[in-house]
Design a protein with these regions (language model features):
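Divalent metal-coordination and catalytic microenvironments
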Residues: 21, 31, 52, 59, ...
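Core dinuclear metal-dependent hydrolase active-site scaffold
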Residues: 1-43, 91-152, 167, 219-220
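Short, charged/polar "capping" segments at the starts of alpha-helices
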Residues: 79-84, 193-196
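Short glycine-/small-residue-rich Rossmann-like dinucleotide-binding loops
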Residues: 53, 111, 162
């Protein structure tokens, strides 16, 4: 399966770090990459979230496939690209709520960085928590297990496990243990060189740390 529905929120893995979130009539895309088929107009993005400007997260070709002329796109300040519709540059710590929500959706902008690798320095990219109804969904972006994760509140966590550029399976499981979501979904593995993480290995590590957390492995 490539999608699950939790409390009326559809979560679909698009492959790599890309996800589609559907709730009521709101369609959200995060880091779309190598999308095979352009969605119908009704399934294009109300909101598009980009975590950083590496080619496998900020792909103009794929963004064009999912965007409408009235889409709202959030990108980190380090990203120099411009897109159709309304583009808002964000930094960690931004909270789009209390009158600044996008189409009724509360979005928190979080740090996302490497601790012991040069690929994603702090301030280069961001993560997001998207609040849809009663569900909080955390997309970590490309990162290691960093200290601020201890304060993240999420019901569903989407975490990279590929190693090399991000956390590996065991580090991601440690992140899951401190975030303590109800559901953890691995991402950023199996598509590109240097993303050789094993989702079953991740699941085993998570279950060893907290068997109450459900790990769901989606097909792209």
């Amino acid at each position: 399966m490539n999608s699950i529905t939790i409390d009326n929120v559809c979560i679909r893995w698009l492959g790599h770090a890309g996800f589609f979130l559907g709730w009521q009539d709101i369609k959200i895309y995060i880091d779309p990459f190598q999308i095979n088929k352009e969605p119908s107009f009704d399934n294009k993005a109300d909101i598009l979230l980009i975590t950083h400007d590496h080619f496998d997260h900020c792909s103009p070709e794929d963004i064009q496939k999912v965007q409408r002329s009235d889409s709202t796109t959030l990108i980190p300040e380090s990203c120099s690209l411009e897109f159709r519709g309304y583009t808002r540059r964000v930094v960690e710590g931004d909270i789009l709520a209390e009158g600044f929500e996008i189409k009724g959706v509360r979005i928190e902008v979080l740090p996302s960085y490497n601790l012991n690798k040069p690929y994603h320095p702090r301030g280069f990219g961001v993560g997001y928590v998207v609040e849809l109804g009663e569900i909080r969904i955390y997309h970590a972006g490309d990162c290691d297990f960093f200290p601020e994760m201890k304060s993240i509140r999420a019901d569903v966590s989407l975490l990279p496990i590929g190693g090399t550029y991000t956390m590996d399976e065991e580090e991601a499981a440690s992140a899951v243990a401190v975030i303590s979501p109800k559901v953890a979904i691995p991402m950023h593995y199996g598509k590109l060189e240097g993303t050789n993480g094993n989702p079953e290995k991740f699941k085993t590590f998570v279950q060893g740390k907290n068997p109450d957390i459900k790990v769901i492995i989606l097909d792209s």
